[in-house]
């Protein structure tokens, strides 16, 4: 039992560490992380505040910034669940979609009529 718990804890740390990212980048006209994973916005969020909690975060994980990341231009940071920093664009929190398993996928676009891919800003 102890071995199983230890392995589960190690796996969880690996997953959380892989979700921590540098500032978004432009890829194929959309915002993505450095690995090419598409990021999304949620219409029910308000500027500077995420309204995606609980089960929502399981399907739409926050796009979490690396420790020490600094806001730049239209990109900002808000406190995410767990005390980490979540990237924002013009105050709108950014997320991944758990259903996107490969770089460049956009399977969450339009989901529920409230989730959207993010076009890369023109100056990007």
Positions of PLM-derived features:
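Bacterial N-terminal signal peptides that target proteins for export
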Residues: 1-9
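Bacterial N-terminal signal peptides
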Residues: 8-17
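Compact beta-sheet-dominated domain cores in extracellular/mature segments
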Residues: 20-124
């Amino acid at each position: 039992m102890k071995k199983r718990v230890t392995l589960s804890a190690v796996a969880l740390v690996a997953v959380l560490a892989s979700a921590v990212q540098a500032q978004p980048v432009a890829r194929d006209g959309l915002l993505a992380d450095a690995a090419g994973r598409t990021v999304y916005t949620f219409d029910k969020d308000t500027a500077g505040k995420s309204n995606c909690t609980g089960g929502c975060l399981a399907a739409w994980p926050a796009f979490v910034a690396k420790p020490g990341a600094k806001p730049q231009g239209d990109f900002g940071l808000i406190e995410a669940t767990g005390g980490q920093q979540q990237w924002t664009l013009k105050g709108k929190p950014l997320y991944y979609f758990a259903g996107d398993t490969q770089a460049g996928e956009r399977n969450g676009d339009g989901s529920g009529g409230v989730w959207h891919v993010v076009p890369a800003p023109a100056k990007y």
